[in-house]
Amino acid sequence: MEKARALEEQWPGARDAFHVPSYASLGLGDQTAAVRYLCGHSLGCMPRKTRGSVEAELSAWSARAVEAHVRHPGGTEWVNTDLPLVPQMARMVGASQQEVAVMGSLTANLNALLVAFYRPRGRRTKILLEKQVFPSDFHAFWNQAALHGLDPAATLVQVAPRAGEHTLRTEDIVAAIETHRAELALVCLPGVQYYTGQLLDMASIVAAARREPSIVVGFDLAHAVGNVQLQLHEWGADFACWCSYKYLNAGPGGIAGLFVHERHHGGTLPRLAGWWGTNAATRFEMRQTYDPLPDALGFRQSNPSVLDVAALRASLEVFEDFGGMERVRARSLALTGYLYELLTQSVFYRPEVGADGVGFTILTPANPAERGAQLSLLFWPHSDDPDKNTMPRVFADLRQNGVLGDERHPDVIRLTPCALYNTFMEVFESVQLLNAALERLAPESAV
């Protein structure tokens, strides 16, 4: 406990900038105290600035209606509502302003980018992805192959962890690229793997793929943006996309973003088109000609949701106020490092899966440079009877006692201390409560 206090003094966060759910608000009793919210990998907490930011746009709507598009009473006119966010978002992902657009939703943006960048020709048709890919991405890849008249099952090449391992090895990804070099049209992987929390070596993956100029490289950064430092331009990725409701704290279904490297600028790439991606000077002249913006903004299709932009604006201001991603990542390394330290000191922790009795291991890499904020815990023993299975019972116990992670069936709980709003004391208390939950189950496993 003393170490937690000392670490908090050394690494102060921005807790006061956020609303954190309480026991009472979650129906867990009448306590007004905040719970230990370790679920920012799924949905980030609401910044206190958000309500005012959104209400300002509601006020503009009520006061000026359509005229707020060009004559806003106190902020950015709606025709340009997303543009002030582009420089901030570019800093978040390590890109130039011309390489980033704030738009759409994650899978919609992924599909839009695949339309532009997945161009199968001759033998070069295959898409390299991971075996544990998030289902929405898998659906996008599968259907892109089908849209091109290809057999998706034969088109998708999936790289998996080795037998007995839980995370991908960079050398295995590189080897898969080399093996299929003559057939690959696209490599598309996560920046941070959603299930295990593994941070992939994106720089090495891009370098390996780009040894063959015909291979396009893209990333789904849903679990990376706002979590780890990114250098998309420097690494040379062709494209990337991300959401904003996890580590960016922009609210459920918040507006997303995409990156298109400057070498693809010029407006010549085929794409899903819409009027918001065309020349702003002539957009409202309703011409029946297509004059796309030359940079990432040319991938926009429709005008963005003003209320979603307002929520993202509030969140990005918190990041800026805190000092940017370098400081966020530094505090995150300390927080998750402390969580890892305490978990591995638990009497129920085992380095390997399958030990006797009740226990858990950590799927996430031990090396801090190979993970973000999230740690994924695998529990045992497993039972097909959900009332007897260890993980759901531990999860329910934790929630009842004010620790909120999330469950991934059948046996994994994900816990994420977020740098902006979680505290070292919360980490300490959460591990204490986890140990207590397992202690309550231990006598049963000994029967």
From Swiss-Prot:
GO terms for cellular component: cytoplasm. SUPFAM superfamilies: PLP-dependent transferases. Its cofactor is pyridoxal 5'-phosphate. One of its GO terms (molecular function) is pyridoxal phosphate binding. The modification N6-(pyridoxal phosphate)lysine is found at K246. One of its GO terms (biological process) is 'de novo' NAD biosynthetic process from L-tryptophan. Pfam families: KYNU_C. It is found in: Cytoplasm. The keyword NAD does not apply. Pathway: Amino-acid degradation; L-kynurenine degradation; L-alanine and anthranilate from L-kynurenine: step 1/1; Cofactor biosynthesis; NAD(+) biosynthesis; quinolinate from L-kynurenine: step 2/3. It catalyses: L-kynurenine + H2O = anthranilate + L-alanine + H(+); 3-hydroxy-L-kynurenine + H2O = 3-hydroxyanthranilate + L-alanine + H(+). Disulfide bonds: none annotated. Pyridoxal 5'-phosphate binds at L106, T107, F134, P135, S136, D137, D220, H223, Y245, W275, N303. Catalyzes the cleavage of L-kynurenine (L-Kyn) and L-3-hydroxykynurenine (L-3OHKyn) into anthranilic acid (AA) and 3-hydroxyanthranilic acid (3-OHAA), respectively. Belongs to the kynureninase family. Homodimer. This is Kynureninase. It comes from Eremothecium gossypii (strain ATCC 10895 / CBS 109.51 / FGSC 9923 / NRRL Y-1056) (Yeast). The gene is BNA5.
